[in-house]
């Protein structure tokens, strides 16, 4: 007797009970309580602060969902766990290190217990970080790496691996031959360099040859920069069929250039935004790596609580790993393409709620 026959021979009252039970179970599985359990997506157990403390944060800019996601993750997790976010500061752009030095210095006067830094440059921060440590402030690195041995812990991502993921998407694409125009990104940013090198190293391993058209590091990460550089590269190299950009705003500019020139080419990039969804669906954006800023922000708060209470910090790679001088956790990254972009849970990983407002900034 198969399962359908058994079901038909079951009394109607029992069948009704089973049906109602299945509905209740389904509701429970999608209830707010379950969402609460899943906000850290199983990466670390959630704890609350035994005693409130003050956390201040400075990031590079708030021009994209990556840094907005980090700030949302920090502020929302802090509310849930009894941590006070006393300052949110923004450097304004990559390279604005003097502005960020002043912001970090100001954290002393407002009594911050933990300073969180997404640096505007890789180098030059060690003296100011050491001065924070000397003042009794714990310092955490978020989102992108910084060259300092005085960081207590970091929540980052493996930028070399992100570059490799983008190259792998090109390798798997059907188009042959493959000719990739490189828009490397701003000079002096370590994450930019690592993604570039990761992409080129992985591209050399493709089963079908990949040729790369290089261009110089430099410029910003705005849409106009991506449009201008992609337009120039395609005009000088008519057989380009892929464009690499390390960040999504540059990538969307490159897509605009492809459309303007009516070219049969596709972009690979990183740091997903919802505006890129239709670009993926129509094939102009081949693949985008998800960078879960919200998860990074939540993890920073969870690790800060443990650091303040002298509790173990689980899952951290030791100092020396990935070329960094401090212990850190690399969040998992996922490639979004036509096969999965429609079902990706953006609100869990990278995009803050539409009604959320950025806190008062300095």
Regions found by a protein language model. Give the residues of each.
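Extracytoplasmic "Venus flytrap"
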Residues: 38-73, 77, 81, 86-101, ...
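Hinge/cleft segment of the Venus flytrap/periplasmic-binding protein
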Residues: 35-51, 203, 303-362
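Periplasmic-binding protein-like
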Residues: 57-58, 108-119, 138-142, 181-183, ...
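Hydrophobic alpha-helical segments within soluble ligand-binding/sensing domains
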Residues: 38-42, 100, 155-180, 194, ...
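Structural motif
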Residues: 39-42, 86-111, 215-236, 251
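Flexible loop/hinge segments that line or gate small-molecule binding clefts
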Residues: 122-161, 172, 179, 185, ...
């Amino acid at each position: 007797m198969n399962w359908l026959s058994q079901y038909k021979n079951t009394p109607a009252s029992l069948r009704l009970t089973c049906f109602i039970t299945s509905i209740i179970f389904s509701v429970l599985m999608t209830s707010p309580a379950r969402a609460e359990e899943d906000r850290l997506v199983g990466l670390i157990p959630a704890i609350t602060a035994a005693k409130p403390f003050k956390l201040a944060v400075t990031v590079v800019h708030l021009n994209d969902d990556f840094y907005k996601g980090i700030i949302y993750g920090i502020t929302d997790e802090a509310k849930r766990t009894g941590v006070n976010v006393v300052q949110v500061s923004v450097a304004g752009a990559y390279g604005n290190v003097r502005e960020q030095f002043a912001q970090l210095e100001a954290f002393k006067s407002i009594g911050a217990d933990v300073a969180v830094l997404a640096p505007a440059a890789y180098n030059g921060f060690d003296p100011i970080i050491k001065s924070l440590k000397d003042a009794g402030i714990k310092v955490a690195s978020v989102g992108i790496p910084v060259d300092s041995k005085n960081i207590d812990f970091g929540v980052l991502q493996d930028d070399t691996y992100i570059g490799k993921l983008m190259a792998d998407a090109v390798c798997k694409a059907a188009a042959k031959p493959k000719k990739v125009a490189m828009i490397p990104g701003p000079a002096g940013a370590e994450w930019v360099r690592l993604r570039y090198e990761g992409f080129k190293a992985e591209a050399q391993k493709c089963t079908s040859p990949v040729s790369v058209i290089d261009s110089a590091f430099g410029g910003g990460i705005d849409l106009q920069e991506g449009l201008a550089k992609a337009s120039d590269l395609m005009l000088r190299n008519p057989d380009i069929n892929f464009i690499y950009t390390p960040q999504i705003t540059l990538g969307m500019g490159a897509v605009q250039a492809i459309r303007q020139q009516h070219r049969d080419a596709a972009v690979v990039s990183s740091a997903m935004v919802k505006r890129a969804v239709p670009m993926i669906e129509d094939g102009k954006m081949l693949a985008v790596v998800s960078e879960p800023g919200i998860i990074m922000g939540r993890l920073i708060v969870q690790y800060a609580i443990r650091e303040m209470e002298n509790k173990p910090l689980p899952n951290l790679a030791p100092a020396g790993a990935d070329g960094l001088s401090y212990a850190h956790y690399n969040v998992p990254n996922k490639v979004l393409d036509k096969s999965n972009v429609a079902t990706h849970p953006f609100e869990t990983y990278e995009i803050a709620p539409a009604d959320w407002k950025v806190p008062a900034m300095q």
